[in-house]
Amino acid sequence: MSTLLLRLAGPVQSWGIDSKFEVRRTENAPSKSGVTGLLAAALGIQRNEDISSLNQLRLGVRTDQEGRLLKDFHTAHSEKNSYITTRYYLSDAIFLVGLECEDKGFLQKLEYALKHPAFPLFLGRRSCPPEAGMV
């Protein structure tokens, strides 16, 4: 069994799993679905494409720095309406994520993709870019 380690750090992160409508919450650590989305973006997998190849990964998360919960009062406008949302982020948090897989070649492919991503990478939400040196 081989493992690929990722250091997830950035000014803000948001790992929402029950975010709906006006309130967008975050978990205290990266979610498996959030990390899967990050990996899919790195690999260039489109939203409508199959991501089952990522199901073979086992995930573990270590919190190296908890960070602080940040609340953002957010307004957005369309032609007809204004929307007010409250979004929560983790500020200055650092996590070490371990991805375990029996297929070492697949982990090497992921490592390359994370160093040369097909799409921009984010820590949960589009407004959350990662620091350099994730892998």
Give residue ranges: language-model regions.
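Charged, low-complexity intrinsically disordered regulatory segments in eukaryotic signaling
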Residues: 1-7
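Glycine/small-residue-rich interface belts in oligomeric ring/scaffold proteins
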Residues: 2, 16-79
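Residues in well-ordered beta-strands of folded domains
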Residues: 7, 60-62, 98
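Short polar catalytic/cofactor-binding loops
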Residues: 8-14
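Structural motif
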Residues: 12, 58, 94-96
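Short helix/loop capping segments that flank catalytic or ligand/cofactor-binding pockets
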Residues: 15-16, 108
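Internal, well-folded beta-alpha domain core
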Residues: 64-135
